[in-house]
Amino acid sequence: MDIIFVCTGNTCRSPMAEALFKSIAEREGLNVNVRSAGVFASPNGKATPHAVEALFEKHIALNHVSSPLTEELMESADLVLAMTHQHKQIIASQFGRYRDKVFTLKEYVTGSHGDVLDPFGGSIDIYKQTRDELEELLRQLAKQLKKDRR
């Protein structure tokens, strides 16, 4: 299964989700290909220093280069998980024919319509809060994918 996590600039939430989920999926024995992109990302940007630090505390390296969301990525994905409802709307307007595989992360995992906190410009504590929120959601995602695999 190919999963893409999407946020705005692909420097905070979606790369954190990608790195966290790769770690969780490996521990859980899930066969997934995980990537991330941004709806307004510039190519080849770096993850924010606070995002790197927040994951380093969990012993997860964040060696990331930002990538814009493209037609090619959308076509190859089985599941596209946006960080906010607004991201989902932008994706639907730009890539309408793929809308059936686009959800917010919270919508897909919990059925709720909430957004993942945007830490951009915030303190390291805000990044840790976002990391912890993502980690909990991604553990639930792994459980759901394992259950669906049966």
UniProtKB/Swiss-Prot annotation:
UniProt site positions, description: Important for substrate discrimination: 11
Organism (species): Bacillus subtilis (strain 168)
Upregulating conditions: Expression is up-regulated in the exponential phase of growth, followed by a significant and gradual reduction in the stationary/sporulation phase. Is not up-regulated during ethanol stress.
Binding site for substrate: 8-13
Membership in a protein family: Belongs to the low molecular weight phosphotyrosine protein phosphatase family.
Consequence of changing residue 118 to A: Completely loss of phosphatase activity
Regulation: Efficiently inhibited by Cu(2+) ion, Zn(2+) ion, sodium pyrophosphate and N-ethylmaleimide, while the addition of Mg(2+), Ca(2+) or Fe(3+) ions has minimal effect. Inhibited in a competitive manner by vanadate.
Entry keywords, A to Z: Hydrolase, Protein phosphatase
Role: Catalyzes the specific dephosphorylation of phosphoarginine residues in a large number of proteins. Counteracts the protein arginine kinase McsB in vivo. Can dephosphorylate CtsR-P; thus, can restore the DNA-binding ability of the CtsR repressor by reversing the McsB-mediated phosphorylation. Is the only active pArg phosphatase present in B.subtilis. Exhibits almost no activity against pSer, pThr, or pTyr peptides. Appears to play a role in B.subtilis stress resistance.
Gene3D superfamilies in the cross-refs: 3.40.50.2300
pH and activity: Optimum pH is 5.5 with pNPP as substrate.
Protein name stated in the entry: Protein-arginine-phosphatase
